[in-house]
Every structure is written in C-alpha cells, then in structure tokens.
C-alpha cells in the first residue's frame, strides 16, 4: 500500500551518494524517464522512479536495501528491462536499482561443468563464454542478446531450447541473494546430488525479487553438440503444424527447439525485417525445428526422419532455416509496431497435449472482436 512508504528525501539521496559515489546515483530527468517502462512500453503503465542507483557488487546492494528499509522507500530491481509484465517498473516510485555493473564471469570450470557469474551478465555473453570452451549453457530466452542472467533466474525464463533442456531453473546449481533485510546469503552448491536440507535456491528462482535480489549465479554447463541443423517446416493448417510436436518427440528425435509462427506473424516480421523473400510469406505457417547431435550420421538420420514426419502431417515444404528465419522468430513482438501502437501481450502455458485446443480457443475468441491477432509459441514445451 502506497501509504506504507515514505517519499524520497534529500537526506536519503545524500546517504545513497555516500554509499555508492555521486556518479552512481541518478536523479536527472533524462535518466528517470529512461526507466519508466519496460519492453512493452505501454503508456498506461509508465511510472517514474525518484532515483536510479547503480551499485557495483552485492555489498553495495545490501547497503541500498538497508537504506531503503531505514527510510521506508520502495525499491525495484531492474536487469535488462526486457520483460513485458511491468516487473521492472517502479509503480510506487522510489528507487530503481540497476544490475549493469555486476557484469563479470567469475569462473568457468571445464572439469566440473559449471560457471559462476554475476547477475548483470548478459545471457548472450554467458552462452558465448561457454561456447568458446566447446560447452553449452542451455538457457536461451528470445531476448538473450539484451536480457541479464539474474533476470532469467528471477522470472524462471523459458526459451527456444526448453523442449530439450528445460527452463532456467533446470540450468542452476546455486544463487547468491541479498535478502529484504540486507543480508548476503549463498544458497545451493555445484553438486549433482545434494540431500542436505531444502533446495532454497530453487525457491528463489521464479520469485521475481520477492524473496531477495539475485546477485550471483552458479550455472550448469554441458558438452556442446558439434552437429546441428535448423529446419523450417511450412504448413497451411495450424492444427497440423502443432500436431507434429508429439510425433517428433515420440520418434526419439529429441529436438532442441520447436518454434511456431502463425502466418500473420510471418508477414509482419518479414516486412519489419525487410525480408520480402521469406518462404511462403503470403500463406505459410512456420514451424522451426532444431536438431543437435554428437554424431553426423545420427544428425542425417534424425533430419530425414523429422522431414518425413512433417510432410506426412501436411507440411507443404520442408527447408533448411537460416539466421533470417530465426531473426523473424525473435522479432515477433517488435514487429507488431508496424500494425499498432498499442499491443496487449499474453504469455500462456498449457500441457503440450492441449496446445492445439488452446490455439483454437484463442483464434475463435479473438475473432469476435476487431483486433489483429499474432500467435507465436515455443510449441515444444506448451508455451
């Protein structure tokens, strides 16, 4: 409740500057305006913070938390700002705390197959550091080029590889957090098996800052499959497109990704990215399938098997997908700006076997209203 908080005072600002240094305490109008929204940029949800702080480490974050408690000032933590549900917006004013200076990879253990990183490291940089050692960090949200690993944990982010490797919580050994009281606590450890007490690190993952501020993470790594193919299966019937998912899984193909774009998405993203030559742009529904293996013969076999399954299910074409196709998938949300300044985004998860029912329901329901509809999905995991 707003009345439980106090307004920011000059004394509070002065204490922040003493703690962090004047350079890292921002109250100018341009900075405050920059952090009034997240990726959705819905004007109805704009909220200006009173002050933006940029701490360097967990100790400074703990100090900020203690000061906010002392003065009863609301505190909002912001990672990459790529969310679309207002989680990084200071709806009660107060402090927005940026994680951008906590941007170091502390350790990459090739023998133990884990990485220790600060929470402000970009997910793309986590992936690149692992790949440089022929290892894989399997978390891969669509916004990996700009989101931060701490935000991935805070929201239990999914992504394009979840069908094979699981979501963010499946990639985490341990976390360090600053509690709401300003204590620094380490939870979990890089052990394959640990039956000592509760798995508190798993409780923190997905808690969206309500249990503490994630400052450091220990991530699982695994060998990087050397052989890979990206396939594009093109359908005209959305139910046929969705129907290939259980068939691919039951066939033992073990795809890394199965992504879905309806035709309105295909048309809008191709225009947004100036890619008029996108395959079947006028009528195609896209299913993007990634297969990765440790054996070239196995890759060839699974690729042929997947192609046969798609064609039998009604695919009008099965092609090799290049980076332009993946760019279309990653830009589904951004491309909506071509058709409307206002966009309502819903993120729905259902059991995989109910995916077709959900999409049919969405199409039928929205058809009652004069709104354009775009559907994209991680259909391999029901999201």
Segments and roles (model prediction):
Residues 1-66, 83-113, 142, 265-276, ...:
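N-terminal flexible segment immediately upstream of the FAD-binding catalytic core
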Residues 2-6, 51-54, 116, 165, ...:
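Hydrophobic alpha-helical scaffolding
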Residues 5-13, 54, 58-61, 119, ...:
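Generic structural signal for well-ordered, non-membrane alpha-helical segments
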Residues 28-37, 223, 234, 242-383:
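C-terminal substrate-recognition/cap domain of FAD-linked oxidoreductases
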């Amino acid at each position: 409740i707003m009345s439980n908080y106090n307004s920011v005072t000059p004394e509070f600002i002065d204490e922040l500057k003493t703690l962090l240094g004047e350079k890292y305490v921002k109250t100018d109008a341009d900075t405050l305006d920059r952090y009034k929204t997240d990726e959705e940029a819905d004007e109805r949800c704009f909220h200006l913070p009173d002050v933006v702080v940029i701490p360097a480490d967990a100790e400074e974050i703990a100090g900020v938390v203690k000061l906010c408690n002392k003065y009863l000032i609301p505190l909002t933590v912001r990672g990459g700002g790529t969310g679309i549900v207002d989680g990084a917006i200071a709806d009660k004013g107060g402090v927005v705390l940026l994680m951008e200076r906590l941007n170091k990879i502390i350790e990459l253990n090739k023998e133990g197959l884990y990485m220790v990183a600060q929470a402000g490291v970009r997910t793309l940089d986590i992936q690149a550091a692992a790949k440089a050692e022929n290892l894989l960090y399997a978390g891969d949200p669509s916004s990996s080029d700009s989101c931060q690993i701490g935000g991935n944990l805070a929201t239990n982010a999914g992504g394009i590889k979840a069908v094979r490797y699981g979501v963010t919580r499946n990639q985490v050994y341990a976390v360090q957090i600053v509690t709401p009281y300003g204590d620094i606590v380490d939870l979990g450890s890089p052990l394959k098996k640990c039956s000592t007490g509760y798995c508190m690190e798993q409780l923190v993952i997905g808690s969206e800052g309500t249990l503490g501020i994630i400052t450091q993470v220990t991530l699982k790594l695994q060998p990087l499959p050397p052989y890979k193919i990206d396939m594009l299966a093109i359908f005209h019937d959305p139910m046929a497109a969705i129907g290939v998912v259980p068939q691919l899984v039951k066939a033992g193909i073990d795809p890394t990704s199965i992504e879905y774009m309806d035709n309105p998405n295909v048309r809008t993203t191709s225009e947004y990215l100036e890619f008029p030559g996108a395959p079947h742009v006028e009528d195609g529904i896209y299913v993007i399938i990634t297969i990765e293996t440790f054996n070239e013969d196995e890759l060839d076999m699974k690729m042929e098997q997947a192609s046969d399954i798609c064609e039998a299910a009604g695919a009008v074409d099965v092609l090799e997908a290049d980076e332009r196709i993946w760019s279309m998938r990653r830009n589904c949300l951004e491309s909506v700006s071509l058709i409307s300044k206002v966009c309502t985004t819903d993120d729905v998860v259902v059991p995989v076997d109910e995916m077709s029912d959900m999409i049919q329901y969405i199409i039928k329901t929205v058809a009652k209203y004069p709104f354009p509809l775009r559907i994209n999905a991680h259909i391999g995991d029901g999201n």
